[in-house]
């Protein structure tokens, strides 16, 4: 009897072994974390990082960054008509917008005036990195909850390429995008793209806005120059976003007609200009340098104020052993928001004081 059981066990083990030999190994593509300036794979990073790539965004059918982030563990997206979506990391609640740093290609844009996530078309996104928890403290004040880093598509090393797209949907929605890029000589890569959309809401509009449409336009110009052991990249983005909204409904009103106009209506109109530049160079086997700089300007035409912010971050990486290195870096930010009109304070009209913020920090990390 024992011999029969032993023979059966050998046959089963042999079959499992043969199956294992025949089954091909699926090797997943490595994901590199770009919030680390010098690049670290997700497997190697010790941070609580989630990456949503362009393929996943497309498979979700996401039309906005808010759509793309829904379903990410630990992330809550709140939206209110007429305002930018708020990303809540780690249950920050009402203070979420002050506890989450938004980066666009590594440049902080959620400063004095905040940043409208809907101004970045999903067609322009390569991936979105979400960093939650204490690992985000190196990104400065306002990162208690975490960091959302939006990485846009870089110029491709091809002679000539391009494409265009058009979508039509409910409520007179039209989305269009077009891009064109190419290589000039052996080292210069260029890319230009445009994305736009117009739409009317599910909700009805008040008479003065009845024939108006929500409208977004976004133009991107990108250039990258390849060095022998590094590169220089410059990106420019101009975007305009106009959104019409109406107020809330009481329950009786909603039950009767959920599409009807609320007790008030209004609109927001924002214009953004963003420039960022990156330089990286490998000096030798032990030393790498990296420089990130950016400028962000926002003009709110509805509230009649404007915001300007500057940012620069130089970093040096010293590799002292295999897979071990020290990174030394500095952060400098300078921002100002100016109000063009008086505001009401305790029922008294007065000139609003301008907001100013300047910060400087240094850091050193060891891996």
Predicted feature locations:
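Face-selective signature of the C-terminal outer-membrane beta-barrel domain
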Residues: 226-240, 267-367
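Periplasmic-side early beta-strands and strand-to-turn transitions of outer-membrane beta-barrels
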Residues: 137, 149, 157-159, 165-167, ...
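Sequence/structural signature of outer-membrane beta-barrel proteins
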Residues: 38, 169-173, 198-206, 241-243, ...
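Extracytoplasmic beta-strand/coil segments of soluble accessory domains associated
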Residues: 66-107
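Residues that define the transmembrane beta-barrel architecture of outer-membrane proteins
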Residues: 144, 167, 172-176, 215-219, ...
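Transmembrane beta-strand segments of Gram-negative outer membrane beta-barrel proteins
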Residues: 29-30, 127, 146, 152-168, ...
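Short acidic/polar hinge/loop motifs at secondary-structure boundaries
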Residues: 107-133
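N-terminal Sec signal peptide and the immediately downstream disordered periplasmic leader
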Residues: 1-60, 66-72, 181-182, 217-219, ...
